[in-house]
C-alpha cells in the first residue's frame, strides 16, 4: 500500500503518454524490495515522500520546496542545487532533496556499463531517480542529502572519470548535437568544439564569476537539434557559404514518386502524390526556389538556410562544400525580460580546431558582460539594454547587413566624435573664413 494517497497524481497515469508518476512509483517499489540488499544512504521511502509533497502542492496550489542556501563540494561553486522541503515532519524522506548535475559527454554517447555504474552510485547514495537529460544537457540526479555529496563527487571523478556540470552564475555545461558522428548535414565538428570549449573554460564552469548563467550550445547544421538558437547565450550553428548542391535527376525522381520525401518519415498514412510546388517551393521562407515543371532552380544569395528543402529531398539536395558556422548571441527563456531568440553576431567562421576564432569572440563578450551586466541579467538582456551596436563595438566586429533586424524608424542619426572629421572642436576663426556673418 502506498505511503501517501495521491488521487490527483494518479490521474496523470491515465493518459496515453508515459507518466513520471508511474516512474517514481516503480522506483519506490524497487527500493522497498531492495533486491540487491543495498545499505541505502538516504531514506528508502524518499520517492514516496516526493509523490506526497507533490500531491500536497497540487492540493494547495503552491510549492513546498525552498532554496535553503548553498550546498556543494569542496573547491566547486556549482554542480549541486540545494533543495529542502518546508514540510520535513510530514515528508522526512525529502527533507533534504538536493539535485546533482553531472556533465554529459559530447553528443551524449554512453556505454551500457557506464550507465550501470552511474545508476549503482545513485541507487546507493541518492533517490534512484534521474532525468536524462536536463534542459542544459546535464545528467540530472534527483534527490540526495548533504553528507552524500562529497561521496558522490569522489566516485564520479575517481571511478567514472566524470565531472560535475554547471549551476549558478557560471558557464553551464556546454552541449552539442551528434554532429559529424551521425549527421550527413554537419557543417563543422560540433562534438569537438563542445569538448574543446568545455576543457578550455573549466574555471568558468566550476567557479561562478558571471552576472548570471551563460550557456554554450553547438548545432552542427541549421536543423538545430539542440535548439541553440533559442536556448543559449552563445550559439554556434553550422552553415555553408557556397550554393546548395542539386542532383537534377534525383529531383525528377522525387516528383515522379520514385523516392519517398523526408527520407520516408511521416509515412504512416497516405499523404497523396508528392507535390514539389506545395511541399518544397511554396514553403521556402525566403521564396528563393523555382520549379518550372522540369527543373528546380535556387537563388542561393536569398537562401536563409532553413533546411526544409534539403530535409524533404535529401537525395536531391545537399549542403554546400564551403562549410563553417555562424555565431549567434543572446537567446534565453522568459525569466526577467521575456524570451529572446539569438541575434546573429558572426555570419561565418571556419570553426576548425582548436576553435581559436570562436574563443576570441567568447572572451571579448565575457569581458564586457562581466563589467556591464547587472546581477541576474542574461547576456541577451544586457544586449537589449545597452544595444547590439555596443556588442559589435566590444567584439570589434564590423557591422554588416545581416546584423540588421529591421529598418530604423528614428530619423535622427547620432554620430560619435571619432566619426566626424575634426571631432567636436572647431576653430571659430577658420570657420568665419568660410562662413561670413
UniProtKB/Swiss-Prot annotation:
Residues 294-322 form the 4Fe-4S ferredoxin-type domain. GO terms for cellular component: sulfite reductase complex (NADPH). It comes from the Bacteria. One of its GO terms (molecular function) is sulfite reductase (ferredoxin) activity. [4Fe-4S] cluster 2 binds at residues 284, 303, 306, 309. GO terms for biological process: sulfate assimilation. [4Fe-4S] cluster 1 binds at residues 177, 183, 221, 225. Pfam families: NIR_SIR (PF01077). InterPro entries: 4Fe4S_Fe-S-bd, DsrA, Nit/Sulf_reduc_fer-like_dom_sf, NO2/SO3_Rdtase_4Fe4S_dom, NO2/SO3_Rdtase_4Fe4S_prot, NO2/SO3_Rdtase_4Fe4S_sf. Keywords: 4Fe-4S, Iron, Iron-sulfur, Metal-binding. PANTHER family: ANAEROBIC SULFITE REDUCTASE SUBUNIT C, SULFITE REDUCTASE [NADPH] SUBUNIT BETA-RELATED. Part of the complex that catalyzes the reduction of sulfite to sulfide. The alpha and beta subunits may have arisen by gene duplication. They both bind 2 iron-sulfur clusters, but the alpha subunit seems to be catalytically inactive, due to substitutions along the putative substrate access channel, and because it binds sirohydrochlorin (the dematallated form of siroheme) instead of siroheme. Heterohexamer of two alpha, two beta and two gamma subunits. This is Sulfite reductase, dissimilatory-type subunit alpha. It comes from Nitratidesulfovibrio vulgaris (strain ATCC 29579 / DSM 644 / CCUG 34227 / NCIMB 8303 / VKM B-1760 / Hildenborough) (Desulfovibrio vulgaris).
